[in-house]
């Protein structure tokens, strides 16, 4: 993938302004120089050697389940769900899984904005503070990009359960990205993952999925929306000429199959990542893409919880644009609306009645500053886009969403770094940039200044 969101450590941190860190803020880890104690009601919990986070002190991840009769019922998941120690794994999701829910505000992203971004808005930039505060409240997906982050899913779902039990109306749904394939990011370097196929990576990945499944079963009364493995399947459509991708093909397919079958649960809706218009929207790529995604769906037994595909994740394409930008190089399928409407019939013809979600987190300014459509790293001239909504105007599109947390880097511009990718050093990439997933203040400012609609 071109980035790894919600990184394990925050880069370019200013000295801590407060003696105590806020709930869900970072409180420790290798190289951390900020506050190491938490506000009342929170405890500093070490997730790994790089990252510790202030989590609710009363939070428990016990696998002992209690029975409830006050489960959430919505138009997208008929019937109530009872939390018991024995769950029948027969997915029942139908209809738009976003309908009837409000989306969870990512606490980690919110803490980045509150504890890093806003204090850094000084001088002439101080006028952006209200917009930054508003951006922190926009729901975005939580990235489970290393196995060590999986326990945070339980923490956040416990918080959602508590808010729903307190009468949240509409009830809250959680949003997560499953992103830890072995030999991840096979066609780039910026977001190489923790598992290697040559070192038991497939089994490590299955263990990672099992941990996620256990949490989803425990919180079966909480509605959860998942994006599955950004870039992975799209790489199998176009990049098998890259040795790492060719070597990873069978592992990617096996692991994706395992993910969508094991996570096929009544409280879950899944979307496979499907690249974007500038990747798979070319005439030569549409049918091969449809063949691959329909095959994955069929090979997994047509899981009821596999709702469809996610597009434009961490990218910049417009949802709908009147005039194709010059960098789209003459492809008439130059926005995400045209892309999904070109792909959907090809999928349907093979038995996959897919619906879609599109990431609008960074596509607010059109055209962008891209010099080439394939330039993906920290692109200049971008802005926050449409807020998450089911008011899409297209029956194929379930929702606009923010999958990529805006302000987290796509990759480092440091040419000496192990994960340096040349795209992050291009003239249309904002520089200097920190490692993928870490906070990039200048990029956040750019997104705020170019936001459309503005905050």
Swiss-Prot record:
Keywords: Carbohydrate metabolism, Cellulose degradation, Disulfide bond, Glycosidase, Hydrolase, Polysaccharide degradation, Secreted, Signal. Its EC number is 3.2.1.91. It is found in: Secreted. This is 1,4-beta-D-glucan cellobiohydrolase C. It holds the Pfam family Glyco_hydro_6. It comes from Emericella nidulans (strain FGSC A4 / ATCC 38163 / CBS 112.46 / NRRL 194 / M139) (Aspergillus nidulans). GO terms for cellular component: extracellular region. SUPFAM superfamilies: Cellulose-binding domain (SSF57180), Glycosyl hydrolases family 6, cellulases (SSF51989).
């Amino acid at each position: 993938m071109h980035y790894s969101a919600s990184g394990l450590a925050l880069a370019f941190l200013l000295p801590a302004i407060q003696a105590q860190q806020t709930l869900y803020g970072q409180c420790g880890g290798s190289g951390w120089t900020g506050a190491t104690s938490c506000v009342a009601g929170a405890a500093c919990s070490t997730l790994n050697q790089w990252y510790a986070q202030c989590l609710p002190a009363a939070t428990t991840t016990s696998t002992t389940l209690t029975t409830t009769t006050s489960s959430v019922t919505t138009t997208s998941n008929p019937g109530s769900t009872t939390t018991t120690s024995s769950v029948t794994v027969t997915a029942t999701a139908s209809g738009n899984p976003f309908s009837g829910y409000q989306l969870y505000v990512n606490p980690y992203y919110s803490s980045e904005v509150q504890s890093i971004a806003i204090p850094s808005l000084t001088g002439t930039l101080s006028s952006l503070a209200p917009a930054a505060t508003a951006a922190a409240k926009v729901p975005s997906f939580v990235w489970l990009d290393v196995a060590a982050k999986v326990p945070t899913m339980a923490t956040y779902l416990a918080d959602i359960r508590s808010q729903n039990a307190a009468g949240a109306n509409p009830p809250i749904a959680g949003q997560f990205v499953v992103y830890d394939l072995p030999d991840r990011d096979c066609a780039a370097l910026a977001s190489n993952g923790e598992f290697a196929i040559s070192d038991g990576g497939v089994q490590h990945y299955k263990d990672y999925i099992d941990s996620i499944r256990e949490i989803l079963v425990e919180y079966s009364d909480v509605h959860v929306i998942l994006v599955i493995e950004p870039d992975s399947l799209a790489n199998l459509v176009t990049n098998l000429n890259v040795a790492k991708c060719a070597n990873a093909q069978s592992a990617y397919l096996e692991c994706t199959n395992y993910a969508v079958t094991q996570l096929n649960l009544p409280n879950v809706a899944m979307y496979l990542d499907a690249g974007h218009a500038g990747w798979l929207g070319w005439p030569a790529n549409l049918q091969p893409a449809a063949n691959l995604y329909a095959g994955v769906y069929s090979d997994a037994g047509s899981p009821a919880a596999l709702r469809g595909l996610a597009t434009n994740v961490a990218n910049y394409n417009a949802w709908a644009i009147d005039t194709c930008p010059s960098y789209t190089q003459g492809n008439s399928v130059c926005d995400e609306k045209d892309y999904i409407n070109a792909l959907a019939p090809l999928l349907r013809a093979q038995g996959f009645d897919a619906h879609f979600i599109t990431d609008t987190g960074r596509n607010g300014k059109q055209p962008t500053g891209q010099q080439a459509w394939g330039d993906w790293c920290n692109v200049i001239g971008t802005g926050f886009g449409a807020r998450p909504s089911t008011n899409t105007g297209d029956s194929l599109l379930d929702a606009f969403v923010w999958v990529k947390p805006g302000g987290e880097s796509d990759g480092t511009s440091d040419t000496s770094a192990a994960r340096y990718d040349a795209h992050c050093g291009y003239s249309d990439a904002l520089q200097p940039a920190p490692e993928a997933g870490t906070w990039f203040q200048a990029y956040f400012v750019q997104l705020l200044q170019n936001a459309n609609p503005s905050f």
